[in-house]
C-alpha cells in the first residue's frame, strides 16, 4: 500500500508481445514467477481470469475446480496477497465465437452462464466476492446480426442468474466500446450502471472503469470515475493509457497524457476512492519491443507515476484554483495546472 491505495495486477499483464501481425517476442513466464514479481513490486492483490486459477477449466468438474481454487488461495496467502477479482474469460472458447450471453445460439448462452457460475465458485474459494464482466464479445461485427434490445435482456438474465447463484457475489461490469467487436453493447459506465438497475439486486451490480476504454469511447476517464462514484459503484479500476482512437493500447499509466492521468487521480481523491477499500489495478502491457529483462517495468512504472501524481494532486493549491474559477479566469487556471505538473 502506498499513499493509502491498494494495488492489484493480473497475470496477463506480463505478456509475450504477440500482436495480430507478428508472433511473441518474449518467453512466457510461470504464474509463480509472476507472483514473485508482483509481491516484490509491492502489489497487494492479484486479478484473475477463471482459467488463470484453473487452467483448462472447461474439461474439469465443479469439485476439481474448487480444489484448484483452494490451492491458489493457499499460494496467495503464503505470498501475503489476496485475490481482488475473478473474471470469466468468455472470449476464447469455440462456444463464444458469436458472443457469450448475447449469442444467437442458446447452447452458447448456456455455456457462458455455466462458466460464469463456476467463476463465482472460484471467487468463493478465494474469498473474493467481486466478479468482473468484461463483455468482450457482447456486441456485433454486423448490427443486423443481433437485436440490441434482446441483447440487453439477455445480459440482465445472465447477471440475475449469477446474483441468484451466490448471495455474496457482486458483479462489476467493465465497459468498453469496441475491440474485439465493431460495436459493444455496454460501451460506457453509464450503460453499465443503467443495466444494473434492471437486475434483480441492483445494489450488487456496479462497475469497473478502464482508462483506455473511456478514451476509446471519446470520453474523459476522470468524468467516468466521478459518474460511477456518484452512484457509489466504482468497485475497481484499470488504470493505463491510450493514444487516441486506435487499437486498445494498454500503455503505462500517464504514458500518453499526463494531464488526463492527473485528472483521474484528482477524481479518485475527491471521491475518497482509497477509503472505499477498492483496489487500483494497472491493466497495462509492455510494448512489443520490450526486452525480456524489462518485461514488468510497465507495471512498476505505472505504480511510480500513480504515486507521484497523488502527490501532485494533494499539493495542488485548491484555494488558488477556486479563486481563478470564481473569477472565470480559466486561462490562468489552465497555466496553473500545466506549471504544477511541470514542477518547480
Ligand atoms: C481488455 C480488458 C481486459 C479485462 C480483463 C478482466 O480490453 O481490459 O484486460 O480487463 O480481461 O476481465
Ligand atoms: Mg481492463
Placement of each model-derived feature along the sequence:
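Active-site acidic/histidine proton-transfer and metal-coordination neighborhood
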Residues: 67-71, 75-206, 216, 293-294, ...
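N-terminal pre-domain/capping segments
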Residues: 1-125, 202, 300-344
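Glycine-enriched alpha-helix->loop->beta-strand junction motifs that scaffold or abut catalytic
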Residues: 42, 129, 201-203, 229-235
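N-terminal cationic-hydrophobic initiation segments that often serve targeting/anchoring roles
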Residues: 39, 73, 163-164, 196-200, ...
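Non-cysteine beta-strand/loop elements that form the S-adenosyl-L-methionine
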Residues: 5-12, 83-89, 112, 133, ...
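Active-site beta-loop-alpha junctions enriched in small/polar residues
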Residues: 12-14, 51-53, 88-91, 136-138, ...
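Gly/Pro-rich active-site loop or hairpin
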Residues: 15-36, 146-152, 182-193, 206, ...
Amino acid at each position: 500500500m502506498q499513499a493509502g491505495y491498494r494495488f492489484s495486477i493480473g497475470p496477463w499483464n506480463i505478456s509475450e508481445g504477440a500482436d495480430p501481425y507478428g508472433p511473441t517476442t518474449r518467453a512466457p513466464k510461470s504464474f509463480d514467477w509472476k507472483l514473485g514479481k508482483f509481491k516484490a513490486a509491492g502489489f497487494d492483490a492479484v486479478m484473475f481470469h477463471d482459467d488463470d486459477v484453473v487452467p483448462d477449466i472447461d474439461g474439469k468438474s465443479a469439485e476439481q475446480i474448487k480444489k484448484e481454487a483452494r490451492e491458489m488461495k493457499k499460494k496467495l496467502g503464503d505470498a501475503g496477497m489476496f485475490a481482488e477479482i475473478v473474471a470469466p474469460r468468455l472470449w476464447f472458447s469455440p462456444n463464444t465465437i458469436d458472443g457469450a450471453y448475447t449469442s444467437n445460439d442458446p447452447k452458447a448462452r448456456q455455456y457462458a452462464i455455466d462458466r460464469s457460475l463456476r467463476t463465482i465458485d472460484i471467487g468463493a474459494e478465494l474469498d473474493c466476492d467481486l466478479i468482473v464482466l468484461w463483455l468482450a464479445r457482447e456486441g456485433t461485427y454486423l448490427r443486423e446480426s443481433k437485436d440490441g434490445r434482446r441483447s440487453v435482456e439477455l445480459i440482465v438474465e445472465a447477471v440475475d442468474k449469477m446474483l441468484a447463484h451466490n448471495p455474496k457475489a457482486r458483479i462489476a461490469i467493465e465497459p468498453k466500446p469496441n475491440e474485439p467487436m465493431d460495436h459493444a453493447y455496454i460501451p460506457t459506465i453509464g450503460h453499465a450502471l443503467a443495466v444494473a438497475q434492471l437486475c434483480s439486486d441492483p445494489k450488487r451490480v456496479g462497475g469497473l472503469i478502464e482508462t483506455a476504454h473511456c478514451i476509446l469511447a471519446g470520453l474523459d476517464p476522470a468524468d467516468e470515475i466521478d459518474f460511477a462514484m456518484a452512484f457509489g459503484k466504482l468497485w475497481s479500476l484499470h488504470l493505463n493509457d491510450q493514444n487516441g482512437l486506435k487499437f486498445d493500447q494498454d500503455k503505462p499509466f500517464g504514458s500518453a497524457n499526463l494531464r488526463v492521468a492527473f485528472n483521474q487521480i484528482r477524481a479518485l481523491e475527491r471521491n475518497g476512492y482509497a477509503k472505499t477499500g477498492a483496489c487500483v489495478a494497472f491493466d497495462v502491457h509492455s510494448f512489443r519491443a520490450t526486452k525480456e529483462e524489462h518485461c514488468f517495468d510497465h507495471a512498476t512504472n505505472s505504480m511510480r507515476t500513480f504515486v507521484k501524481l497523488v502527490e501532485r494532486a494533494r499539493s495542488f493549491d485548491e484555494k488558488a484554483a477556486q479563486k481563478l474559477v470564481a473569477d472565470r479566469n480559466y486561462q490562468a487556471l489552465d497555466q496553473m495546472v500545466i506549471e504544477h505538473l511541470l514542477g518547480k
